[in-house]
Amino acid sequence: MQVILLERIAKLGQMGEVVKVRDGFARNYLLPTGKALRANAANKARFDAERSTLEARNLERKSEAQTVADVLNGKSFIVVRSAGETGQLYGSVAARDIIEALAAEGFTVSRNQVELNNPIKTIGLHNVTMHLHAEVEIAIEINVARSAEEAERQAKGESLTSADAIYGVDEDALRPEDFFDPDADRDGDDE
């Protein structure tokens, strides 16, 4: 089906372009959400008449997204999750969890604005890309940790996958030879 795009859509085209898309994509997404019109003479004339208002509305949305992007870009958010000693999470951090972390800080974004190809399954610092507008893209840092204190240590650059880092215990003191020496004489066992 041929459609006229009413706004820029990633991987599809710019506003005003006539593009060919699959019928289901047009009927189920583009047309109901008001992102496109069927490409016919009447709709082409309608688009030409409304072009300036559409461009103004798009510019307004872009400027709103840019103001949010200026505040959010490069900012770090902490997500606390349970994890094993190796740093593997018991579960994962998905786009929904990132949105909740942003909402806790007072930012409102939708799930489709977060670009997360696979859920986060390990503790550490992870960069996440967000598309606030078709032309506004930012990167935020998600700090996944077992606790808030651990997140602070992680942000300073410490590795948190050893027993010392997790529990504050020196791994060298946990060696078996320090507990038991088979060659040592036992006290009181002289024969």
From Swiss-Prot:
Signal peptide: none annotated. Disulfide bonds: none annotated. GO terms for cellular component: ribonucleoprotein complex; ribosome. GO terms for biological process: translation. Pfam families: Ribosomal_L9_C (PF03948), Ribosomal_L9_N (PF01281). Binds to the 23S rRNA. This is Large ribosomal subunit protein bL9. It comes from Allorhizobium ampelinum (strain ATCC BAA-846 / DSM 112012 / S4). The lineage of its organism: Bacteria, Pseudomonadati, Pseudomonadota, Alphaproteobacteria, Hyphomicrobiales.
